[in-house]
Amino acid sequence: MIGISVTVITEIVGLVVGLVSGYFGGAIDSVIMRVVDFIQILPQMPIIIVLTTVIPNYNAVTLVFLIAMFGWTVTARYFRSFVLSQRGRDYVLASKTSGSSNFKIMFREVLPNITSMIIIDVVLSIAGNIGIETSLSFLNYGLPSTTPSLGTLIGFANDPVNVINRPWLWLPATILLLVISLSINYVGQALQRAGDARQREN
C-alpha cells in the first residue's frame, strides 16, 4: 500500500507540474525545471532517514509523504517532455484559435493524448516506490517495526538471533518482493513497447 500511495501522490503532483511546465514553456518552464533540478540533486535516502528520526509521531502516512516529496520530480520531468511535443500540434493550435482557456486545453485536450504514458509511468513507479519503502524498512528507517511489510520482515530476519536460529526467515519475503517487482516491471515494459509502437504509427 505504501508504494501505491506514494505513486498516486507523485503522479498527481508530477502530472500537474509537467503539464504546466511543458504547456507554457518559456520563463515558467525554466523556473519550474530549476526547482526540479535542485530537488533531484539532493541525497534522497539520507534526507529521508534524518527526517524519520526527528519527526514526532512518525507513521506510515509520514513515510508516504517523505518519499513522495522527492518522487514527483521524476514524474514531472517525464510528462513535461511529452507535453512539449504536443503543444505545437494542430489540435492545440486550433483550440487556442477558438478561444479555449489554457486550463481547458491542458486538461481536456493535451491530457487525454498522454493517457498511455501516464499508465506506463504509474506501473513502473509502483515497482520503484515499493523498492524504496522496502530499503528504508530494512534499515529500520521505514515503517515502524510493528507494521507488517516486506521490508520489516526482511529486516527482522537480519536480527542476529534469527540469523542463527532461523536463517531461512528472509527467503519468503525476498522471493515475494522479487516476484512483485519483476512482474510490475515486465508489465510496464510491455506497455511501454506498445506505446512506442503506437507513437511511431501516429
Where are these regions (language model features)?
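Generic hydrophobic transmembrane alpha-helix motif, especially the helices
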Residues: I9-V13, G22-Q86, M117-I119
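Transmembrane alpha-helix signature in integral membrane proteins
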Residues: M1-Y23, I180
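Transmembrane helix boundary and interhelical loop/hinge segments in multi-pass membrane proteins
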Residues: F82-Y91, A190-R198
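Conserved G/P- and acidic residue-centered "switch" motifs that form tight phosphate/ATP-binding loops
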Residues: G14, G18, G99, P112-I114, ...
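C-terminal transmembrane helix and the adjacent membrane-cytosol boundary/short C-terminal tail
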Residues: T52-I55, N59-A60, V64-F70, S116, ...
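Transmembrane alpha-helix boundary and packing residues in multipass membrane permease domains
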Residues: L19, I49-T53, I67, R77, ...
